[in-house]
């Protein structure tokens, strides 16, 4: 019995010792991490001079500090702060305290008392300002702690009387960021505190230092951004600052006046030295208009930009901005009848041609002039004639915004916008054209205005010309002479710049469809028809003749009497153009002929609900594929893929979703075919052909998943997870095929290890989405991960093969809006049989013009590939300036590709195509573990692969041997 008790005692003692060993091991693991505070303390103690201490602090600032080490580091810094006499070192310590208080996971309320205490005893103004900045960082980190906010506001108020402008600036900044907001509170103290903050800040509008005045205005604007409603009394204070000597103050005051005018637009304010009253928004509009003539171009730009957002202004004040002569000698202008009546009633004698023209008049008191009229008068005229092009651009943008909200103002500002088409700066001309296009629905061009607009077609800039073509597409013309003038000028443009052909044809298409009644009387002249004589048939290869036909045919679509004027050859030309240029020539009901329909039958009308319902039903039906036998599953997938592809052809609005779903089902079909039992039941050497089939299927699945991930815009994270999961299955299939055809075990170790690393990487990147992947391939892999890590390659391959067959078909959630990226190469057309000749060894420039649809970040992803007959491939990276953005989801690529090669004996064709570069690492969501890992910054910008997304164009070239 005693021996048994002794044995039990030893057993219990042994268990206790094991627990102690675990604790000791844990402590050792923690102690391996060096202490930041201890290292900093040792460095500061080693410093023999303030310069050394400052150097150590600068080195420490470059190293990251963990949240659990921040408090110890702060204590060391504060301890050294009290000992330090040099202000530069104290300044750096104060800066470090502010940086450390922003550390994620650290609550800075424990250092606030120390920061306030050292603030009370500090004498250096620079250190004071830095300490206030630290307190601002602490207060911003603790927004819910009202007591802390109030305490910091009190500290800021006490130091507002400091003689240094930097300290006062920081105090005002702290008040603007931490001042209490007005809410539904019951205590009067909180409401009064909010009002006091505004009053305290407003008192510093008249500070002697302009930097403090600017900081006070910005603090008031910060209160507004945080949700505090500013008082109307601030308006008068801000108006006085418009005449300040410093541009920073005037610029901030303009912004504050705009804010108050948006808060109290309908409030009534008196006009100085007058019995009249006016709406506050009108008064503010006049004052901001006055600042368009400010001496500083920065203030003028800001004033012009703010004018565009003041849509509540009265129409008569708005119209004053376009008339310089509204004020006569800074007086209110009276009508001619009133002036004549006053002259005759005065009885003044005149020796000149005009009655009373030399009569004495009272001296004008410029200080008593009504500021509203003198401010708003001609503001936009001054802005559009400014010497700085930035001001002119801002004025044009403001005109656009106001004209969009007021059709009457749009008509009145039309002349001024048309005049801006002749500006010396290309950017201003381009902005003016874009502005007119935005307001084109509210205006109709007169002939003189149209003449000025069409003169821009001679501009050497392609961007200007194409922007003008876009403008003419949506412009209303008043007369048939205007249509004829536009056609003549566009044909001149076509002759001078043949590369504008497609843009001009598109312009004439919309010009004809918008003005059918104006085109009708011009048809006999344009087609050169005669009532009695047959005229010669024009050349169908002439781009100018095609342009005329495009104009006429689009006008005939809504004008049923026009086809009767067509001759026989015109009808033949219509049939030809309807086939070759169907996107420019509409379907017409011609006499004696059937309606030429489009590719979509007329009885099919796009209804979103039935098509969407059919799409959903097809996908729901196919997700039951795992319950069918392999042959039935393959047939169901094939039929569904065919239906989805046809649906995408018929319904353009569902093309992206249908193609996306069909591609995913195609990947699943390839996987099912590759996993058929007959391929794997016999030894691999007897089925090399089937192994090649499985390897090709894995490769194709990889390519299709990259297309799904990077060729479609609107793909969300939940779709990326499913796509990456499918790619992981393809990699597993590739590993299985490689293992069956590889001799020896050694090469498999590296491949299996790499695959398991990819599985682990997938888990870490998409850990939040793993619950949605139950019973999937990766879910079963993760369950067996410890076993896989310890298994031999042969066992790993067997497990992968079993899990691939048993994995379920994952449901792919469809995004709300998804579009497939596409590109069309316009130039080179690839139709010419004349080779492009150049000397071998030198280069020749090939112009490339392409339209891009639904491409994300084209500046970094779109590449141009040139494939030579000998197999050489050249990839060109277009410059960011080569891309244009004509509309949402659309881009235009205009670039030059330089070709070079050795001498050839005869001309051959090179292929030009557009590629979409991708990097799968850039789409992976950022995880905390990834941020801490040491990853190369080049991974984000490197190119992992490319996807062709345009049809190749073949160009004849002929490198000639150099002459000797």
From Swiss-Prot:
InterPro entries given in the database record: ARM-like (IPR011989), ARM-type_fold (IPR016024), INTS4_8HBD (IPR056235)
One GO CC term on file: integrator complex
Regions crossing the membrane: none
Covalent link Glycyl lysine isopeptide (Lys-Gly) (interchain with G-Cter in SUMO2), residues: 792
GO biological process terms on file: RNA polymerase II transcription initiation surveillance; snRNA processing
Glycyl lysine isopeptide (Lys-Gly) (interchain with G-Cter in SUMO1) crosslink location in chain: 792
Signal sequence, renumbered to the chain: none
Entry-annotated residues carrying N6-acetyllysine: 27
UniProt subcellular location: Nucleus; Cytoplasm
Coiled-coil intervals, chain numbering: none
Pfam families: HEAT_2, INTS4_8HBD, INTS4_C, PDS5
Keyword set, alphabetical order: Acetylation, Cytoplasm, Isopeptide bond, Nucleus, Repeat, Ubl conjugation
Principal subcellular localisation of the protein: nucleus
Record keyword Transport present: no
Intervals holding HEAT repeats: 67-106, 146-184, 191-229, 230-264, 278-314, 370-406, 407-445, 447-485
Gene Ontology MF annotations: protein-macromolecule adaptor activity
Role according to the record: Component of the integrator complex, a multiprotein complex that terminates RNA polymerase II (Pol II) transcription in the promoter-proximal region of genes.
Family of this protein: Belongs to the Integrator subunit 4 family.
Subunit structure: Component of the Integrator complex, composed of core subunits INTS1, INTS2, INTS3, INTS4, INTS5, INTS6, INTS7, INTS8, INTS9/RC74, INTS10, INTS11/CPSF3L, INTS12, INTS13, INTS14 and INTS15. The core complex associates with protein phosphatase 2A subunits PPP2CA and PPP2R1A, to form the Integrator-PP2A (INTAC) complex. INTS4 is part of the RNA endonuclease subcomplex, composed of INTS4, INTS9, INTS11 and inositol hexakisphosphate (InsP6). Interacts with BRAT1; interaction is required for the assembly of the RNA endonuclease subcomplex.
Protein name: Integrator complex subunit 4
Species this chain originates from: Mus musculus (Mouse)
